[in-house]
């Protein structure tokens, strides 16, 4: 489905259009490819999106030695990587399902590597590869499933951290609450901050 001309004129319509992909990964990726060039302007200027900066500050507080390897999962155009880089983090890897979004991320010049991968599927990293995983704005309706957390745990070193944002409604209704409880019960991870 192509973005119609009217969609290009309204930021709100672009967001609705992307979110209406019906959970189809291929369609979602195509829609993000088409939105990539306008994404930063839409999100920052129209919606006042500040989560990348806020989460990056939290990451810096929990991982104060900047010589750590971080995965930006669902990196999009690289807003989180840009914020982490501004705080001194240099070993950053980005993954996203949209090549168009990854191209925008590459243009920011803050990632060591950018790779096309789909959250919820096996990730092409060795076990215990990263000191931390950061996932901002990706756990939302029709995007990455709760099962993504299993791979985050697998690729994070023991004692590492997984930082993610999620809206309460998605947490309650899309399997994340149950997944988190199961991971805590099986001692695979421990929640340290809300």
Language-model features, listed with the residues they occupy:
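Conserved alpha-helix/loop element of class I SAM-dependent methyltransferases that forms part
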Residues: 48-68
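Class I SAM-dependent methyltransferase SAM/SAH-binding core
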Residues: 71-122
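A short acidic, Gly/Pro-enriched loop at the edge of an enzyme's catalytic core
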Residues: 122-133
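A short beta-strand submotif of the Rossmann-like class I SAM-dependent methyltransferase core
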Residues: 135-138
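Conserved beta-strand signature within the Rossmann-like core of class I S-adenosyl-L-methionine
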Residues: 159-167
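Conserved Class I S-adenosyl-L-methionine
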Residues: 174-194
């Amino acid at each position: 489905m192509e973005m119609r001309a009217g969609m290009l004129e309204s930021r709100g319509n672009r967001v609705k259009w992307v979110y209406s992909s019906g959970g189809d990964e291929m369609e979602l990726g195509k829609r993000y490819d088409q939105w990539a060039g306008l994404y930063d302007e839409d999100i920052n200027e129209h919606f006042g999106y500040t989560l990348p900066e806020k989460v990056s500050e939290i990451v810096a507080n929990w991982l104060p030695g900047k010589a750590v390897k971080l995965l930006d999962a669902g990196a999009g155009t690289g807003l989180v990587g840009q914020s982490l880089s501004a705080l001194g983090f240099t070993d950053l890897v980005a993954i996203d399902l949209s090549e168009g979004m990854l191209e925008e991320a590459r243009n920011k010049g803050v990632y060591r590597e950018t790779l096309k991968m789909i959250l919820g599927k096996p990730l092409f990293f060795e076990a215990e590869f990263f000191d931390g995983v950061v996932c901002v704005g990706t756990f939302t309706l029709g995007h990455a499933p709760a099962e993504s957390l299993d791979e985050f745990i697998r690729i994070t070193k023991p004692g590492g951290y997984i930082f993610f944002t999620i809206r309460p409604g998605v947490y309650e209704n899309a399997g994340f609450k149950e997944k988190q409880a199961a991971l805590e019960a099986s001692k695979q991870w421990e929640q340290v901050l809300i």
